[in-house]
Curated annotation (Swiss-Prot):
It comes from the Eukaryota. The keyword Nucleotide-binding does not apply. The keyword Transmembrane helix does not apply. Residues 1-16 form the signal peptide. This is Beta-defensin 37. Disulfide bonds join C29-C58, C36-C51, C41-C59. Its main location: secreted. The lineage of its organism: Eukaryota, Metazoa, Chordata, Craniata, Vertebrata. Pfam families: Defensin_beta. Belongs to the beta-defensin family. InterPro entries: Defensin_beta-like (IPR001855). Keywords: Antibiotic, Antimicrobial, Defensin, Disulfide bond, Secreted, Signal. It comes from Mus musculus (Mouse). Coiled coil: none annotated.
Amino acid sequence: MKFSYFLLLLLSLSNFQNNPVAMLDTIACIENKDTCRLKNCPRLHNVVGTCYEGKGKCCHKN
């Protein structure tokens, strides 16, 4: 019984991801102190790149 719980724990931990949306473009955007948005950037912000594997926009404040 304890062994089956241990196997279930290992299976659960193997499928766990720390941050599944943090890809290279997202990390680069955040390191430049910009913000990631899924839709349009707020007013007074420029689009300077992408986030979330091209699905979002990296916004830089003017």
